[in-house]
Amino acid sequence: MGKALPYVELPLPSSELALVRPACYFFLMTDTEALSLKGRLLVAMPTIGDERFERTVIYMCAHSHEKGAMGLVLNKPVDGVDFRELLDQLKITEVAIDKLPVQYGGPVEKTRGFILHTTDYKSDGASAVSEEISLTATLDILRDIAAGCGPDRHFLALGYAGWAPGQLEDEIKANGWLVADGDAGIVFDSAIDAKWDHALASMGISASNLSSSGGRA
């Protein structure tokens, strides 16, 4: 297995460092006891109650009632973190691609790197999340991306969102997030500022259809 991505020493903007998860997220989903959210999208409702989390889309990488849940925020850019500087810090010298957006993945381990990518890329460190998407957190994939021989599509994030066992199930019952299919097009191709709208559209709804009480209109 490849060496895990080390923690990034580049300072994050103070606004990002202050980004903490509110006391309670809100979700809307039926049959919560039977359905795993792994490989799906959590889409923030207008009633989220915290402007720092408005229009948030989270790709769920793991979820079980015994171990809790883990996901990556898809639409919160990290300003002030340059990909080329990151490569220099990690002593990656074979560089054909030196420009790649660095996204904010969540409030846990905010300087640790995680890469979502298409399953055409195979490595010992890759963990399949769905038929189309894998998660890798090793230096090997970052080297390959920089060298131009990485996966067809990829998404680099710092940090992740995590839930203790039972926490996510409790939050789902509060009715304030929607759950959408984990469309690879939304994960990799949609513009950052369009992911929320595209995730809603994948369910056949728009922001104007959402009721102020947290469910569908």
Task: Give the predicted meaning of each segment.
Residues 5, 26-28:
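Short hydrophobic targeting helices and cationic amphipathic motifs
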Residues 5, 12-13:
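Short, often N-terminal, low-complexity regions
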Residues 29-217:
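A short aromatic-anchored loop/beta-hairpin motif
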